[in-house]
Amino acid sequence: MAGLPNSSNALQQWHHLFEAEGTKRSPQAQQHLQQLLRTGLPTRKHENWKYTPLEGLINSQFVSIAGEISPQQRDALALTLDSVRLVFVDGRYVPALSDATEGSGYEVSINDDRQGLPDAIQAEVFLHLTESLAQSVTHIAVKRGQRPAKPLLLMHITQGVAGEEVNTAHYRHHLDLAEGAEATVIEHFVSLNDARHFTGARFTINVAANAHLQHIKLAFENPLSHHFAHNDLLLAEDATAFSHSFLLGGAVLRHNTSTQLNGENSTLRINSLAMPVKNEVCDTRTWLEHNKGFCNSRQLHKTIVSDKGRAVFNGLINVAQHAIKTDGQMTNNNLLMGKLAEVDTKPQLEIYADDVKCSHGATVGRIDDEQIFYLRSRGINQQDAQQMIIYAFAAEQTEALRDEGLKQQVLARIGQRLPGGAR
């Protein structure tokens, strides 16, 4: 079994956590576990894992705790947002902390039925881990032509434990957005305390013909957390999906978005903003398959890297042989705020069709001294000038948020991670 020197110990622990549930695990979860054990954990020698440090994670003692929190603890971490909220604590759904969904336009069932869930677009070891260890699946449906008045908020609260142990929590959701339906879904990840924990997340979304999805992910976990996520989007003809991810917290945060455009005239937007600080690593990955013609995609991924932080971007657009009139663009812009900050970027195109319009690009730079001088000459001090430029750099992402209150809360989180703190 290939992998890190201590990977077998981590795999054995995860196997033990799986077996602790006895016969509760579905056949599909068992298959994912077997695939995980066969594959093993990657090393830095694997190209796709070259910049994602796993040593600190796999040397841990993993536990799975069923924590309880009060409504007051939930509220202290919650977004101020008029929404239909489902609350999950340490990988488990908590009805007492969640809103009722009757009459909301969202049909929700929570069980371990995994039949009919889509296959992974791009499977890898941590996807198999989450699929095997997730306690249940949250099945969400918006029926044909329905347009729920409120967004659906999936709030995930994970707590760390004292000492050497690491609480591991895995969340598995699936959304079916039926023909002509329209919905906004928000994933919110937070930490209950400042101790280490490991979060695994998996969200698959079917966007049917003429349906419209607004998806927002807010990863606001603590500086010691590890977070590995895999989101799959599948779009039918004339479907639209906008996905905005704000990756603002975690020692190691790796977020994968994989998409298939399986119907003509579908439209996709994927935006992300990552802000690793101190020694944090944030790894953003996208995989996009243009499988049908006349589709349009735009991706804009930005990072602001401070101190000794590291940002990684790896994105690929694949245009199938008969996907004519494809229009796909992918851009990665990176702003370095520290002398030891690092960025590794790899946008890629694979085109097998004629008559397409595709492009990719990446930029890496620092704040222009002339910009600082211009603002200083107008009476703005050095730190305020620097922060104004950073906010302007991030604005292209935050302005995509329709709800003004939510936008202000994201901006506040950004401010907490700025050099010198928010002003």
Q: Where do the PLM segments sit?
A:
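Short, low-to-moderate order helix/coil transition modules at the start of elongated helical scaffolds
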Residues: 1-202, 210-212
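Conserved beta-strand/loop scaffold segments within soluble protein domains that form the structured core
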Residues: 116-380, 394, 401-423
